[in-house]
Protein backbone atom coordinates (compact mmCIF):
# COMPACT_ATOMS: atom_id res chain seq x y z
CA UNK A 1 0.00 0.00 0.00
CA UNK A 2 2.82 2.39 0.88
CA UNK A 3 4.62 1.64 -2.39
CA UNK A 4 1.53 2.16 -4.53
CA UNK A 5 0.46 5.31 -2.71
CA UNK A 6 3.87 6.94 -3.09
CA UNK A 7 4.75 5.37 -6.46
CA UNK A 8 7.90 3.82 -5.03
CA UNK A 9 9.93 1.19 -6.88
CA UNK A 10 11.08 -1.48 -4.44
CA UNK A 11 14.46 -3.12 -5.04
CA UNK A 12 15.08 -6.04 -2.66
CA UNK A 13 18.69 -6.51 -1.60
CA UNK A 14 18.41 -10.27 -1.12
CA UNK A 15 22.06 -10.91 -1.93
CA UNK A 16 22.57 -13.66 0.69
CA UNK A 17 19.03 -15.05 0.79
CA UNK A 18 18.53 -17.12 -2.35
CA UNK A 19 15.99 -19.86 -1.62
CA UNK A 20 14.72 -18.29 1.62
CA UNK A 21 10.98 -17.81 2.13
CA UNK A 22 8.74 -15.54 4.18
CA UNK A 23 5.15 -16.75 4.63
CA UNK A 24 5.84 -19.34 1.92
CA UNK A 25 6.89 -16.68 -0.60
CA UNK A 26 10.46 -16.49 -1.87
CA UNK A 27 12.54 -13.50 -0.84
CA UNK A 28 13.25 -11.56 -3.98
CA UNK A 29 9.66 -11.79 -5.24
CA UNK A 30 8.14 -9.05 -3.06
CA UNK A 31 9.63 -6.06 -4.86
CA UNK A 32 9.82 -4.82 -8.43
CA UNK A 33 13.44 -5.96 -8.62
CA UNK A 34 15.72 -8.08 -6.46
CA UNK A 35 19.44 -8.73 -6.39
CA UNK A 36 21.36 -11.86 -5.41
CA UNK A 37 25.11 -12.32 -5.04
CA UNK A 38 27.06 -15.31 -6.35
CA UNK A 39 30.30 -14.33 -4.62
CA UNK A 40 32.46 -17.28 -3.57
CA UNK A 41 31.09 -17.61 -0.02
CA UNK A 42 27.43 -17.72 -1.06
CA UNK A 43 24.97 -20.58 -1.50
CA UNK A 44 25.61 -20.50 -5.25
CA UNK A 45 29.00 -19.26 -6.41
CA UNK A 46 30.21 -18.08 -9.79
CA UNK A 47 33.22 -16.50 -7.98
CA UNK A 48 31.96 -13.00 -8.82
CA UNK A 49 28.71 -11.50 -10.08
CA UNK A 50 25.15 -12.39 -9.26
CA UNK A 51 21.58 -12.19 -10.50
CA UNK A 52 18.84 -9.57 -10.87
CA UNK A 53 15.19 -10.65 -10.90
CA UNK A 54 12.29 -8.60 -12.25
CA UNK A 55 8.61 -9.04 -13.08
CA UNK A 56 8.14 -8.18 -16.76
CA UNK A 57 9.86 -8.20 -20.16
CA UNK A 58 10.19 -4.43 -20.31
CA UNK A 59 12.26 -4.33 -17.14
CA UNK A 60 14.25 -7.39 -18.26
CA UNK A 61 15.20 -5.61 -21.48
CA UNK A 62 16.29 -2.50 -19.58
CA UNK A 63 18.47 -4.58 -17.23
CA UNK A 64 20.03 -6.55 -20.10
CA UNK A 65 20.83 -3.33 -21.92
CA UNK A 66 22.30 -1.66 -18.83
CA UNK A 67 24.59 -4.62 -18.11
CA UNK A 68 25.98 -4.52 -21.69
CA UNK A 69 26.99 -0.90 -22.38
CA UNK A 70 23.39 0.08 -23.23
CA UNK A 71 23.42 -2.31 -26.21
CA UNK A 72 20.25 -3.47 -27.98
CA UNK A 73 21.73 -6.93 -28.55
CA UNK A 74 19.74 -9.98 -27.32
CA UNK A 75 16.69 -7.96 -26.22
CA UNK A 76 13.22 -9.38 -26.80
CA UNK A 77 12.26 -6.20 -28.68
CA UNK A 78 15.54 -6.00 -30.62
CA UNK A 79 13.87 -6.07 -34.06
CA UNK A 80 11.51 -3.25 -33.12
CA UNK A 81 14.44 -1.11 -31.98
CA UNK A 82 16.42 -1.86 -35.14
CA UNK A 83 13.48 -0.82 -37.33
CA UNK A 84 13.20 2.45 -35.42
CA UNK A 85 16.89 3.32 -35.96
CA UNK A 86 17.55 1.93 -39.44
CA UNK A 87 20.37 4.37 -40.19
CA UNK A 88 22.53 2.85 -37.44
CA UNK A 89 24.27 -0.48 -37.96
CA UNK A 90 22.15 -2.94 -36.01
CA UNK A 91 25.20 -4.82 -34.74
CA UNK A 92 26.27 -1.78 -32.74
CA UNK A 93 23.07 -0.03 -31.74
CA UNK A 94 23.18 1.58 -28.30
CA UNK A 95 19.89 2.78 -26.80
CA UNK A 96 20.90 3.55 -23.23
CA UNK A 97 23.83 4.44 -21.03
CA UNK A 98 25.20 1.30 -19.47
CA UNK A 99 27.98 -0.72 -17.88
CA UNK A 100 30.05 -3.80 -18.61
CA UNK A 101 28.52 -6.14 -16.04
CA UNK A 102 28.34 -9.26 -18.18
CA UNK A 103 29.77 -12.41 -16.62
CA UNK A 104 32.32 -14.40 -18.55
CA UNK A 105 31.04 -17.59 -20.19
CA UNK A 106 32.85 -19.78 -17.68
CA UNK A 107 31.43 -17.82 -14.71
CA UNK A 108 27.92 -18.15 -16.14
CA UNK A 109 28.39 -21.89 -16.73
CA UNK A 110 29.70 -22.43 -13.19
CA UNK A 111 26.78 -20.52 -11.69
CA UNK A 112 24.02 -22.06 -13.81
CA UNK A 113 25.27 -25.59 -13.15
CA UNK A 114 24.61 -25.14 -9.42
CA UNK A 115 20.92 -24.21 -9.58
CA UNK A 116 19.80 -27.84 -9.70
CA UNK A 117 21.71 -28.40 -6.45
CA UNK A 118 20.46 -25.29 -4.65
CA UNK A 119 17.91 -27.07 -2.45
CA UNK A 120 20.56 -29.59 -1.41
CA UNK A 121 22.99 -26.76 -0.62
CA UNK A 122 20.36 -25.07 1.56
CA UNK A 123 19.62 -28.31 3.45
CA UNK A 124 23.33 -29.02 3.93
CA UNK A 125 24.03 -25.56 5.32
CA UNK A 126 21.19 -25.94 7.81
CA UNK A 127 22.54 -29.34 8.91
CA UNK A 128 26.03 -27.87 9.36
CA UNK A 129 24.66 -24.91 11.30
CA UNK A 130 22.70 -27.20 13.62
CA UNK A 131 25.73 -29.47 14.12
CA UNK A 132 27.99 -26.57 15.07
CA UNK A 133 25.49 -25.00 17.47
CA UNK A 134 24.79 -28.34 19.16
CA UNK A 135 28.52 -29.02 19.51
CA UNK A 136 29.09 -25.63 21.14
CA UNK A 137 26.18 -25.53 23.58
CA UNK A 138 26.77 -29.09 24.84
CA UNK A 139 30.44 -28.39 25.53
CA UNK A 140 31.42 -27.86 29.18
CA UNK A 141 33.24 -24.69 28.10
CA UNK A 142 29.99 -23.14 26.86
CA UNK A 143 29.14 -20.00 28.87
CA UNK A 144 26.72 -18.26 26.50
CA UNK A 145 29.59 -16.48 24.80
CA UNK A 146 27.24 -15.73 21.90
CA UNK A 147 23.55 -15.90 21.06
CA UNK A 148 22.26 -17.36 17.81
CA UNK A 149 19.68 -15.89 15.48
CA UNK A 150 16.58 -18.07 15.40
CA UNK A 151 13.70 -18.09 12.95
CA UNK A 152 9.96 -18.43 13.52
CA UNK A 153 7.35 -20.47 11.66
CA UNK A 154 6.79 -17.70 9.09
CA UNK A 155 10.37 -17.94 7.88
CA UNK A 156 12.16 -20.67 5.98
CA UNK A 157 15.79 -19.52 6.07
CA UNK A 158 18.54 -20.15 3.58
CA UNK A 159 21.57 -19.86 5.83
CA UNK A 160 24.41 -17.94 4.23
CA UNK A 161 26.63 -18.32 7.26
CA UNK A 162 26.50 -18.95 10.99
CA UNK A 163 25.50 -15.58 12.41
CA UNK A 164 26.09 -14.85 16.08
CA UNK A 165 25.77 -11.94 18.49
CA UNK A 166 28.54 -11.55 21.05
CA UNK A 167 27.63 -11.51 24.72
CA UNK A 168 27.97 -7.94 26.05
CA UNK A 169 30.97 -9.14 28.07
CA UNK A 170 32.92 -9.45 24.80
CA UNK A 171 31.73 -6.26 23.09
CA UNK A 172 35.01 -4.40 23.63
CA UNK A 173 37.07 -7.49 22.77
CA UNK A 174 35.43 -8.15 19.41
CA UNK A 175 38.48 -7.33 17.29
CA UNK A 176 40.71 -9.51 19.47
CA UNK A 177 38.29 -12.43 18.99
CA UNK A 178 38.11 -11.82 15.23
CA UNK A 179 41.90 -11.79 14.97
CA UNK A 180 42.29 -14.96 17.05
CA UNK A 181 39.76 -16.78 14.86
CA UNK A 182 41.71 -15.69 11.78
CA UNK A 183 45.03 -16.87 13.19
CA UNK A 184 43.51 -20.21 14.21
CA UNK A 185 42.16 -20.80 10.71
CA UNK A 186 38.49 -19.79 10.93
CA UNK A 187 37.57 -17.08 8.46
CA UNK A 188 35.07 -14.60 9.86
CA UNK A 189 33.60 -11.17 9.40
CA UNK A 190 31.11 -8.75 10.94
CA UNK A 191 27.46 -9.13 10.00
CA UNK A 192 27.60 -7.27 6.70
CA UNK A 193 28.46 -3.58 7.07
CA UNK A 194 26.77 -3.21 10.43
CA UNK A 195 25.05 0.15 10.71
CA UNK A 196 25.65 1.48 7.22
CA UNK A 197 25.26 5.07 8.38
CA UNK A 198 28.65 4.67 10.06
CA UNK A 199 30.32 3.98 6.71
CA UNK A 200 32.44 6.87 5.33
CA UNK A 201 30.90 6.44 1.87
CA UNK A 202 27.67 8.03 3.15
CA UNK A 203 29.28 11.19 4.50
CA UNK A 204 29.17 12.92 1.12
CA UNK A 205 25.35 12.69 1.07
CA UNK A 206 24.89 14.76 4.25
CA UNK A 207 21.97 12.63 5.40
CA UNK A 208 19.71 13.89 8.16
CA UNK A 209 19.59 10.45 9.75
CA UNK A 210 22.32 9.68 12.28
CA UNK A 211 23.67 6.26 13.17
CA UNK A 212 22.57 6.75 16.79
CA UNK A 213 18.95 6.87 15.59
CA UNK A 214 19.10 3.15 14.76
CA UNK A 215 19.86 1.29 18.00
CA UNK A 216 19.17 -2.21 16.61
CA UNK A 217 21.55 -1.66 13.69
CA UNK A 218 24.11 -0.32 16.16
CA UNK A 219 23.76 -3.43 18.33
CA UNK A 220 24.43 -5.70 15.33
CA UNK A 221 27.32 -3.42 14.31
CA UNK A 222 28.93 -3.79 17.74
CA UNK A 223 28.10 -7.44 18.50
CA UNK A 224 27.69 -9.23 15.16
CA UNK A 225 29.91 -12.12 14.04
CA UNK A 226 29.68 -14.30 10.93
CA UNK A 227 31.52 -17.54 10.17
CA UNK A 228 31.04 -19.52 6.99
CA UNK A 229 28.99 -22.62 6.27
CA UNK A 230 30.00 -25.24 3.72
CA UNK A 231 27.91 -26.80 0.96
CA UNK A 232 28.97 -30.27 2.14
CA UNK A 233 28.27 -32.02 5.44
CA UNK A 234 30.88 -31.36 8.13
CA UNK A 235 32.52 -34.36 9.74
CA UNK A 236 32.68 -34.89 13.51
CA UNK A 237 36.38 -34.09 13.36
CA UNK A 238 35.66 -30.75 11.67
CA UNK A 239 32.93 -29.73 14.12
CA UNK A 240 35.16 -30.69 17.06
CA UNK A 241 38.02 -28.66 15.60
CA UNK A 242 35.76 -25.65 15.12
CA UNK A 243 34.51 -25.89 18.71
CA UNK A 244 38.07 -25.97 20.06
CA UNK A 245 39.04 -22.94 17.98
CA UNK A 246 35.88 -21.10 19.02
CA UNK A 247 36.56 -21.52 22.73
CA UNK A 248 40.25 -20.60 22.32
CA UNK A 249 39.24 -17.40 20.52
CA UNK A 250 36.84 -16.45 23.32
CA UNK A 251 39.45 -17.07 26.00
CA UNK A 252 40.24 -13.35 26.31
Summary of predicted features, one role per range:
Residues 10-12, 190:
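Hydrophobic residues in well-ordered beta-strands that form the structural core
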Residues 12-45, 61, 90-95:
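Conserved active-site segment immediately N-terminal to the catalytic lysine
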Residues 8, 32, 223-225:
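Short, well-ordered coil/turn segments that N-cap beta-strands
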Residues 1, 21, 57-252:
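PLP-dependent aminotransferase class I/II
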Residues 45-50, 109-111:
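Adenylate-forming
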Residues 8, 48-49, 118-119:
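Short active-site oxyanion
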Residues 1-9, 19-22:
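Active-site core of PLP-dependent enzymes with the aminotransferase class I/II
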Amino acid sequence: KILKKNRIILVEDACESIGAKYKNKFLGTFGDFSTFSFYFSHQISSVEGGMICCKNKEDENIIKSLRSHGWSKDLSNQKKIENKFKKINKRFLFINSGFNFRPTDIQAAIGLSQFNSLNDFIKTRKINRDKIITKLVLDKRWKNQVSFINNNNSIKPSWFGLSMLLNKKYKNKKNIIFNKLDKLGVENRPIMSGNFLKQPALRKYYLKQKSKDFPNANFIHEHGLFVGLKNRILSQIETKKFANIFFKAFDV
